[in-house]
């Protein structure tokens, strides 16, 4: 419901070196054509029931992907190769023992490298904007980002505290355009360090408990973790639900989300 209208996408042809197969068409799954701009001609209001009326004031809503444009201008493979992110990506590979990136057989580690890269920048800017890790709202989004980055760092073999090092890189590479990062450097690093250490205290134990739960599911021929067990991981070991889901999905399991939400609701009612 709300303002809407026809839309148009602008694609950039990156050339045959990025693909020349049947999937390499505008709007396809290939890498050759990259959408860099989206335009919506807002001229109708949808009442939510499929009824459209003309807007009194029509407008054009447009948005360009800045780093997608950088991908095109710098002629690189993805946003993780542009100058604003490459040094952070390379730092993560170095901390992981000098692993290769986009090498034969490196798909799984590439995913973890990209997640750590993306999440490190996101957490740094969120904290700079005054968002603090918590169990509610934006604060919980930040907490989930940090904890997911920790997990993927461990998947890469990075041991010990590493997120403050990544935040330092983000600050150094972005401070010219965002001077507030330098002004809040110590604050950002202290928040990241404290949140990482807090999760570290329960992470390994929680992973062991989850592994035991997986074994029990295998023995029972069950592919779904109960909501109660997922809530235990959240409540006792600090595992966000999406973290647990991601770990289990990698191994072919699912989570009873309705059961998790019911357990969460029950605890909140008891706490009143």
Question: Which stretches of residues belong to each language-model region?
Answer:
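A glycine- and charged-residue-rich anion-binding loop/surface
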Residues: 1-272
């Amino acid at each position: 419901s709300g303002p809407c209208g026809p839309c148009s996408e602008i694609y950039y042809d990156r050339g045959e070196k990025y693909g020349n197969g049947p999937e390499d068409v505008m709007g396809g799954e290939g890498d050759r054509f990259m959408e860099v701009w989206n335009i919506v001609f807002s001229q109708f209001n949808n009442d939510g029931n499929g009824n459209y009326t003309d807007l009194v004031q029509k407008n054009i809503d447009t948005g360009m992907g800045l780093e997608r444009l950088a991908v095109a201008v710098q002629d690189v493979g993805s946003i993780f190769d542009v100058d604003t992110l490459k040094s952070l990506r390379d730092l993560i590979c170095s901390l992981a023992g000098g692993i290769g990136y986009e090498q034969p057989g490196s798909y799984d580690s590439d995913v973890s490298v990209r997640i750590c890269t993306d999440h490190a920048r996101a957490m740094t800017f969120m904290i700079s904007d005054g968002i603090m890790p918590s169990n509610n709202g934006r604060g919980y989004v930040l907490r989930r980002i940090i904890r997911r980055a920790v997990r993927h760092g461990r998947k890469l073999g990075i041991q010990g505290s590493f997120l403050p090092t990544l935040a330092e890189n983000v600050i150094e590479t972005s401070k010219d355009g965002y001077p507030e990062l330098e002004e809040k450097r110590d604050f950002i690093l202290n928040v990241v360090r404290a949140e990482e250490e807090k999760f570290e205290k329960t992470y390994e134990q929680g992973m062991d408990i989850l592994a035991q739960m997986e074994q029990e599911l295998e023995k029972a021929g069950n592919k779904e973790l109960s909501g109660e067990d997922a809530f235990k991981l959240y409540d006792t070991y600090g595992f966000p639900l999406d973290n647990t889901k991601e770990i289990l999905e990698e191994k072919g399991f699912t989570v009873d989300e309705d059961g998790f939400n019911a357990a969460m609701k029950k605890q909140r009612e008891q706490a009143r």
